[in-house]
Amino acid sequence: VAFQVTSSSNECAEIKKHGLHNLQWVLSNDTTLNRFLKNNNITFDIESKLMYINDIAYDVDYEKYNDLDVISKRKEQLHKIGHKIYYDFQINAFLFCKDIYDYSTIHEAPEFLYTLSLLNKATKEIDLKWKNICKPYVVKFKSKLKDFAYFTFYGSEREYIKDRQDNWLMLSRLVDTFFSRTSWTMLPYVENHSISV
C-alpha cells in the first residue's frame, strides 16, 4: 500500500471517479487543477512545450535551458517548470513517512504550483490561492513494487537490472529506510500514468 498526499476542493470526487494521474495528463485534460489554472489565465500546450500566461507564450522545454552558461532568473524558473512537466511528471507517492507535515507543504498545494508561483508577478501566490480553496487529503492505493520507477530504489538503471531477479538490494534499502531515524521517508515514483483508487 502506498499513499499520495494531495489537496482537493471537491472532497477528491475527481480522484474517486478517474483515479490518480500524472502531471502531463492533469494539465492536458478537464481537471480541477487545469480549470483552476485557466481561471487564473494560465494554460499549457503539453505537446508543443508551451505555457501561456495572459496569452503570452513561454517556452517550457527544459532541455533547452540545460547547457546555458548564464541563465536568467526567469529562464531558471522556466527550466524548473519544464522539469516538473517533462521529467518529474509521474505520480509521486509515499511508502511510509514519519510526519507528512515535516516533509513539505504538499498537503496544502501541489509542488508544481509552488514552482509556478516563483515565475513572475502573474503567477505569484498561485499556490496560496489553491490552498485557500482546498483541503488536504491522503489517498491510499495498492501497488506492486514493480510499478515504481527504478530510481526509487536504485542509484542507476544498471544496478536495477542486476538486482531485478532477487530484489535483495531494493528490499534492503526499504528496510534500512524504514528503520533509520534520520530518513524515515520513502518516496517512490509510480511509472503508471494513472492509478485507480
Which role does the model predict for each range below?
Residues 1, 9-15, 28-41, 86-89, ...:
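Conserved NAD+-utilizing ADP-ribose enzyme module
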Residues 1-85:
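ADP-ribose/NAD+-binding catalytic cleft of ART/PARP-like enzymes
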